[in-house]
UniProtKB/Swiss-Prot annotation:
Taxonomic lineage: Bacteria, Pseudomonadati, Pseudomonadota, Gammaproteobacteria, Moraxellales
Annotated stretches, region: Ferredoxin-reductase: 98-338
Gene that specifies this protein: antC
FAD-binding FR-type domain location: 103-206
Name the UniProt record assigns to this protein: Anthranilate 1,2-dioxygenase electron transfer component
Keywords assigned by UniProt, alphabetized: 2Fe-2S, Aromatic hydrocarbons catabolism, FAD, Flavoprotein, Iron, Iron-sulfur, Metal-binding, NAD, Oxidoreductase
């Protein structure tokens, strides 16, 4: 029996490998061209150290000088001593080039549609089935897309979960003069080819053991759509609270899809928040951190995922510090304005 294992690196690259039931993780990686750093292969030196972020694994001998009891409690592991017992994801705190891992997968995808889901947002639908058996990625990760007939690339989070038919979705904000935005408005046609590099990013859904708080700003929602799709298919579902902030009512998108999660996820709550609300808006207004409930968040431990503009993320983190809410794990991804930004 093979297990699908994601190897994530500090430069944001992810490589998926197949690991046999009784195979050491290090051996499986090397067999598939990913030469994880190593010295001893005996569980002593600690060179092949990583962290298991999701999945079940066992270790053979681990010397106390390589990993302490505290390290082991934090799911630190040695690839040379690790055997996986389920699909899993591991993080290694070094650049993937050290492993001679090569480039992430570049795929020729086909445009199957562009769907306007708000006045300022579209979903780009791509089909990757002609060029890859199934694209593996972790819910929350992103891809780089090359705008046809240019050297420009833009990065967007997957808005759905991996699927056998390789139908992919990306939530894209339509900017007044954005490179991708202009392409979608003026030149994009069904049947065109887009080159995609994927999967990328260290922002993804870890193994779920505690309640979840998702905080999305603008098209940062895209990453959470993939996560929610994944959670909805799981037999053991955590409670999930989604806070979704946008500038105006016109920016809200995927409202019907978001409300269906209440039917698919047992303990799901959804809180749309408008920062520049009109007089007609009857919901929450202002900024997301102004609507977080200190009492609720202090009652239990939880994992918080944040995706969106840097000011939103910093405001939430500052609020958590000011309220002395410490029993939470925070994972975040900022949308930055650059040649490879998610714009």
């Amino acid at each position: 029996m093979n297990h699908s294992v994601a190897l994530n690196f500090a430069d944001g690259k992810t490589f998926f490998i197949a690991v046999q039931e009784d195979e050491l993780l290090l051996d499986a990686a090397v067999r598939q061209g990913i030469n994880l750093p190593l010295d001893c292969r005996e569980g002593v030196c600690g060179t092949c150290q990583g962290t298991c972020e999701t999945g079940i694994y066992e270790q053979e001998y681990v010397d106390e000088d390589a990993l302490s009891e505290r390290d082991l409690a934090k799911r630190k592991m040695l690839a040379c001593q690790t055997r996986v017992k389920s699909n899993a994801a591991f993080y290694f705190d070094h650049h993937s080039s050290i492993c001679n891992a090569g480039e992430t997968l570049k795929i020729a995808t086909v445009v199957t549609g562009v769907e306007l889901v708000s006045e300022t947002t579209a979903i780009l639908h791509l089909d990757a089935s002609q060029h890859v058996k199934q694209l593996d990625f972790l819910p929350g990760q992103y891809a780089r897309l090359q705008i046809p007939d240019t050297d420009d690339w833009r990065s967007y989070s997957f808005a759905n979960r991996p699927n056998a038919s390789n139908q992919l979705q990306f939530l894209i904000r339509l900017l007044p003069n954005g490179v991708m935005s202009n392409y979608l408005r003026e030149r994009c046609q069904v049947g065109q080819t887009l080159i995609m590099e994927a999967p990328l990013g260290s922002f993804y859904l870890r193994e779920v053991e505690r309640p979840l708080v998702f905080i999305a700003g603008g098209t940062g929602l895209s990453a959470f759509l993939g996560m929610l799709d994944n959670i909805a298919e799981q037999p053991n579902q955590p409670s999930v609270h989604l806070y979704y902030g946008v500038n105006t009512e016109a920016d809200l998108c995927e409202q019907k899809r978001l409300t269906t999660y209440a039917e698919r996820i047992k303990n799901f709550s959804y809180h749309p928040i408008i920062s520049k609300a009109s007089e007609q808006w009857q919901g929450k207004s202002g900024f997301i951190h102004e609507h977080l409930d200190k009492n609720q968040l202090s009652e239990q431990s939880f994992d918080m995922y944040l995706c969106g503009p840097p000011p939103m993320i910093e405001a939430v983190k500052t609020w958590l510090d000011e309220q002395a809410i410490a029993d939470c794990h925070i994972y975040s991804e900022k949308f930055l304005q650059s040649n490879t930004a998610k714009t």
